[in-house]
């Protein structure tokens, strides 16, 4: 008998075995083909199936896995390569080749000065000092007068005055002298207070824009830098069940009987069971009753033979 594994491949029953373990393969088990070789399901999954990117072990159909781009990990292997902390769903991490790094390990170093280049601008201070309107800024105190504190007069603006100044600033951040005189009449403030307020407002907006620009550059550098190495920032998702254990489709094995086999069996069966007329003729010849039989009996017997060319008649010597 032959085993047909695919439409154009056939094996003898004794020749169809797993190329790795030698297990006989038949129509009762699953067979996989690769490069002209047959494999059982266990060896095919072990050799050519998807493996964990960390431990390089194969997956079973019941394993829960974590995916990062094209890489698949066991739940226990989905850890930071630097600190060994297991990454949970929702954690931010960075993928460098097959290694995973948590945000704390791939983020910028705590020392901002070391991370900046020689031409990088210095970050703005955390707290910005604001000049107080109503009194011109005096000279900076010397080191021996650092302990002394000067009392500054602060001008408190009401809601109406602030609304008027902000509306004018939105229309023109640098008003001319005529506009300032109109603001003095509308708000009741001194020209010096109005001038200082516009200066402070422009300074605040400029520092705010510089700070926002630096934050955007820092976020961009966090995404593309990994302590001097490039990586891909990702967010861990929920574990999923690994269903595709092997890549490839199983091939059905069928028992196949060649056409000449059926013809040979028919010929053997015909030889074992001769026709009834032939058996009767043989029995007559062995018993010797053919010579004593009448011509009518011989004629009737010969008529039962399908391939006898002439009728048998008794010879004159026998009569």
From Swiss-Prot:
Biased amino acid composition, Low complexity: 286-303
Superkingdom of the organism of origin: Eukaryota
A single GO cellular-component term on record: nucleus
Annotated stretches, region: Disordered: 106-151, 218-237, 286-319
Skewed-composition ranges (Polar residues): 218-230, 304-319
GO biological process per UniProt: axonogenesis; neuron fate specification; positive regulation of transcription by RNA polymerase II; response to retinoic acid
UniProt KW keywords: Developmental protein, DNA-binding, Homeobox, LIM domain, Metal-binding, Nucleus, Repeat, Zinc
Pfam family, one: Homeodomain
Protein name: Insulin gene enhancer protein ISL-2
Natural source organism: Gallus gallus
Phylogenetic classification of the source organism: Eukaryota, Metazoa, Chordata, Craniata, Vertebrata
